[in-house]
């Protein structure tokens, strides 16, 4: 008996990407897989007919764009599977990608989330195995709250030479292809929809770890991703969501003692980042302003964030020292 798996794909106005991804998923070798496409506020009449072309695929339509987080949560509500995979619509897949993930999940009852190896799609088509920026071989974080990945630091990505081909515990699983035990996602309330997009998977992974679940990489499972196809890297909107959601995530999940030293330092670092963005052309003023917009969001929403924090901290079963035992102080000085 194979555990059932629903692939949940939030979709927003890129039919060419979705069609390519669904074509690839059709080649997946797994007998108990279904697909849920969540249309985030779109009005494309042809989307219904597109989804009907694929076996075991169905469409859920939302009246408004609720972002990646909201689309995934709606898919979760419509799923009755044992496991779900939250997946970007600009992906392609090795035929055995899902079987490897299911096997890894069945080996350990404490698994909350798993991440496949994520390679960059376009270089792969040219014969180059390069890790994808958005997840690579597994998500990590430093003690200042800056995320990085095995196989990627800052904007630099490594060639996949098998250096991360042993599965290991990671800090977060990428939302490009995030395999999750459905009961765990429901227990934790799914994604925080106030994130809208960017870093919501880090927040959910962090809450899983606080609740005592494991997050691991499964490098035998391979997914290919066309990074930046939905929102270009370096855009003011991407800068805004990354800075905004990173601070929200810290406020929710870090200990009170850590926040006493971390928040003043992060304020200084964000101001420094805004000055750096001013030197960029074109669009430096908008990029710099995005940092202050992010800061303003967290100030205005501080009370609501603290309410979420109380919920997270009241249910945690793993202490701060255990969570950060192998986490570097800064990715500048990681060993």
What spans do the regions from the language model cover?
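Glycine-rich, basic loop-to-helix element that forms the pyrophosphate-binding segment
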Residues: 62-79, 89, 100
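Active-site-adjacent helix/loop segment of glycosyltransferases
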Residues: 211-307, 315, 321, 326
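A short, conserved alpha-helix in the catalytic core of glycosyltransferases
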Residues: 165, 169-222
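A conserved acidic beta->alpha catalytic loop
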Residues: 24, 39-48, 64, 94
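Short, acidic, metal-binding catalytic loop of nucleotide-sugar glycosyltransferases
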Residues: 23-32
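Short aromatic/hydrophobic "clamp" motif used to bind/position activated sugar donors
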Residues: 84
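Short beta-strand/loop segment that forms part of the nucleotide-sugar
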Residues: 32-41, 60-62
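Conserved donor NDP-sugar-binding/catalytic core segment of glycosyltransferases
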Residues: 92-135, 139-146
């Amino acid at each position: 008996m194979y555990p059932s798996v629903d692939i949940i794909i939030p979709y927003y106005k890129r039919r060419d990407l979705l069609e390519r991804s669904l074509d690839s998923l059709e080649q997946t070798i797994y007998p108990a897989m279904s697909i849920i496409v969540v249309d985030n506020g779109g009005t494309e009449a042809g989307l219904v007919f597109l989804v009907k072309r694929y076996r075991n695929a169905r469409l859920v339509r939302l009246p408004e764009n609720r972002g990646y987080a909201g689309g995934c949560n709606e898919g979760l509500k419509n799923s009755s599977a044992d496991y779900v995979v939250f997946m970007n619509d600009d992906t392609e897949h090795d035929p055995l990608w899902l079987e490897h993930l299911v096997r890894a999940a069945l080996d350990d009852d404490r698994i909350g989330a798993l991440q496949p190896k994520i390679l960059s799609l376009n270089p792969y088509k040219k014969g180059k195995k390069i890790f994808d920026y958005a997840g690579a071989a597994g998500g990590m974080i430093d003690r200042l709250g800056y995320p990085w990945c095995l196989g990627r630091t800052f904007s630099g990505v490594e060639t996949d030479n098998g250096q991360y081909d042993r599965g290991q515990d990671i800090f977060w699983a990428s939302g490009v292809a995030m395999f999750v035990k459905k009961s765990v996602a429901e227990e934790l309330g799914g994604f925080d929809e106030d994130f809208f997009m960017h870093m919501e998977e880090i927040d959910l992974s962090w809450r899983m770890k606080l609740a005592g679940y494991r997050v691991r990489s499964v490098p035998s499972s391979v997914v290919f991703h066309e990074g930046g196809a939905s929102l270009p890297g370096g855009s003011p909107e991407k800068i805004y969501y990354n800075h905004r959601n990173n601070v929200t995530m810290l406020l929710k999940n870090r200990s009170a003692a850590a926040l006493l030293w971390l928040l003043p330092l992060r304020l200084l670092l964000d101001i420094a980042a805004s000055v750096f963005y001013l030197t960029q052309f074109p669009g430096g003023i908008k990029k710099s302003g995005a940092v202050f917009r992010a800061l303003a969001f967290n100030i205005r929403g501080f009370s609501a964030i603290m309410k979420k924090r109380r919920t997270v901290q009241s249910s945690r079963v793993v202490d701060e020292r255990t969570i950060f035992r192998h986490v570097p102080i800064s990715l500048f000085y990681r060993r």
